[in-house]
From Swiss-Prot:
Protein name: Peroxisomal membrane protein LPX1
Gene3D superfamilies to which the protein is assigned, alphabetical: alpha/beta hydrolase (3.40.50.1820)
Swiss-Prot/TrEMBL induction comment: By oleic acid. Transcriptionally up-regulated by YRM1 along with genes involved in multidrug resistance. Expression is also dependent on RSF1 and RSF2 for transcriptional induction during growth on glycerol-based medium.
Chain residue ranges for the region called Peroxisomal targeting signal type 1: 385-387
Record GO terms (molecular function): triacylglycerol lipase activity
Protein localization: Peroxisome matrix
Gene Ontology biological process terms in this record: triglyceride catabolic process
Stated role: Has acyl esterase, lipase and phospholipase A activity.
PANTHER family in UniProt: HYDROLASE ALPHA/BETA FOLD FAMILY (PTHR43194), PEROXISOMAL MEMBRANE PROTEIN LPX1 (PTHR43194:SF2)
EC number: 3.1.1.-
Remaining remarks: Present with 2350 molecules/cell in log phase SD medium.
Alphabetical keyword list: Hydrolase, Peroxisome
Length: 387
């Protein structure tokens, strides 16, 4: 993002509490979050007719806030007509991902609950977007995979924060394990198909003998093999860190995210997915579902469920895209995001919002008018005047 147009700050805050059982090694452990805030340097000089926009990006499992950096300048420059302007952008690392994982090392437990992750997002977003000097704005949440799940969960938990949800193949319903299983195992117990677990282990290595082995693996053996070259380089540069206890250049390298925490993102899903599945029906916001045409990451029931259950659902299929379409074909996804934001802004009641400075007496008059209007809509005539 252009440095003269936006100021970048990296911040740290405490994660939401209390959390799901076993989310930390000890009950007294407290987790932290690291996130980036991009604030417009031009926000005070904006035209009153331009809609102000805040964007919150949520990454998928095994990723981090860095996967979205490629998007930022291309989203900022999208509206040449001046219908809207971006005020703030938030990029968040979940507690066991990226820079947050580094801060929480030694405290993370075996239960990474995506609902807790949504609560973390809400804590940051309400703080950053709801400050007393904030102007009326449209808040848009954009989430991929796990982040799409969490975007939906955010609207369930706090339905008045986000105005538009853009979901890039959110993972809500997953494939069930087919096999002997364990007799009597409750359906909401942690479980993962063994073949999926083994495949994930090969794609989520976290320790390497040296820099060369690290780069070779990230380019040829990780989930990001087919990622856009710039995004892949951003990931390589961001995830690299020295192995514990090694301060020498040329020594062992590790990723910021531990492999075990990466695997836990998938192993725990059956324990918290039922909550969202039961509550998606209450999401009323316009919800854009972007999905790659050739993705087979989720079973067909995932898309069918969202299409049937969400009240304001819009499907947008990216030709040739996979589940990782956000990192493999980012320009196509950016084009669709810009289109949906532009379309939403033009029909938004906040497009020309401006709150004048009013005295207490003027506010009282304003309320009386609002109450009379509300009463006229709510009042139902009855045959008896009194109860």
């Amino acid at each position: 993002m252009e440095q003269n147009r936006f100021k970048k700050e990296t911040k740290t805050c405490s994660a939401s509490w209390p959390r799901a059982p076993q989310s930390t090694l000890c009950a007294t452990d407290r987790l932290e979050l690291t996130y980036d805030v991009y604030t417009s340097a031009e926000r005070q000089r904006r035209s009153r007719t331009a809609t102000r926009l805040n964007l919150v990006f949520l990454h998928g499992s095994g990723m981090s806030k860095v996967v979205w950096e490629y998007y930022l300048p291309r989203l900022v420059a999208a509206d040449a007509e001046g219908n809207y302007a971006i005020d703030k952008v938030l990029l968040i690392d979940q507690v066991n991902h990226g820079d947050s994982a580094v801060r929480n090392r030694g405290r993370l437990g075996t239960n990474f609950n995506w609902i807790d992750g949504a609560r973390d997002v809400l804590k940051i977003a309400t703080c950053e977007l709801g400050s007393i000097d904030s102007h009326p704005a449209l808040n848009v949440v954009i989430g991929h995979s796990m982040g799409g799940f969490q975007a939906l969960a955010c609207d369930v938990l706090q339905p008045n924060l986000f105005h538009l949800l853009i979901l890039i193949e959110p993972v809500v319903i997953t494939r069930k394990a087919i096999g002997a299983g364990r007799p009597g195992l409750p359906p909401d117990s942690p479980q993962i198909p063994e073949n999926l677990y083994n495949s994930l282990r090969l794609k989520t290595c976290d320790h390497f003998a040296n820099e060369s082995e690290y780069v070779k693996y990230m380019r040829n053996g990780s989930f990001f093999t087919n990622a856009h070259s710039q995004i892949l380089q951003n990931i390589i540069d961001f995830e690299r860190t020295k192995a514990s206890g090694d301060d020498e250049d040329g020594g062992p390298v590790r990723t910021k995210m531990e492999q075990a925490q990466n695997l836990l993102c998938y192993m725990n899903m059956q324990t918290f997915a039922p909550f969202l599945i039961s509550n998606v029906k209450f999401v009323r916001k316009r919800t854009i579902h972007i999905v790659g045409a050739r993705s087979n990451w989720c079973p067909p029931q995932n898309q069918l469920f969202l299409q049937k259950t969400l009240q304001n659902y819009h499907l947008d299929v990216i030709p040739g895209g996979s589940h990782l379409v956000n990192v493999e074909a980012p320009d196509l996804v950016i084009e669709r995001i810009n289109h949906h934001i532009h379309e939403f802004v033009l029909t938004s009641p906040l497009q020309s919002s401006h709150i004048p400075q009013l005295t207490l007496e003027e506010r009282a008059v304003m309320f009386d008018r609002a109450f009379d209007s509300f009463k006229n809509e709510a009042l139902v005539k009855t045959t008896k005047q009194k109860l």
